Amino acid sequence: MEMTNAQRLILSNQYKMMTMLDPDNAERYRRLQTIIERGYGLQMRELDREFGQLTEETCRTVIDIMEMYHALHVSWTNLKDAAGIDERRVTFLGFDAATEARFLGYVRFMVNIEGRYSHFDAGTHGFNSQTPMWEKYQRMLSVWHACPRQYHLSSNEINQIINA
């Protein structure tokens, strides 16, 4: 992250204020303030992760993934015979915190701040699937989009989607 000296000074002052406003996280803010003031390039890359962005297209894809899981769960619930399909297979797991942190952060924002998909169970890991999921979800979306009745899926269609 490239910053002018003026930008670094402003950000350093912001971290100094946050230290006073949020004493519970004061150590974290003091650390970030030191990194900014001294211009430690390696550690400044951490800010790239904090201040990164998701494109509108990526946000819409994440919402589409969540919507697919909503449709899967509703369809599974409405099946007369759901035998052979474990409920865990139609439950949204989230994204991997280690490799897909931006997607995970957006999911948490959508559920916890925006109040959407509040019926999703965050589990004990807060939507951290602990394994990369993006490519799997892309394959699943392709199959789901090909289904004629996306919110009234048959058991065969559900199986095709979750096994994609």
From Swiss-Prot:
It comes from the Bacteria. InterPro entries: UPF0304_YfbU, YfbU_alpha-helical_sf, YfbU_helix-hairpin_sf. Pfam families: YfbU (PF03887). Belongs to the UPF0304 family. This is UPF0304 protein KPK_1463.
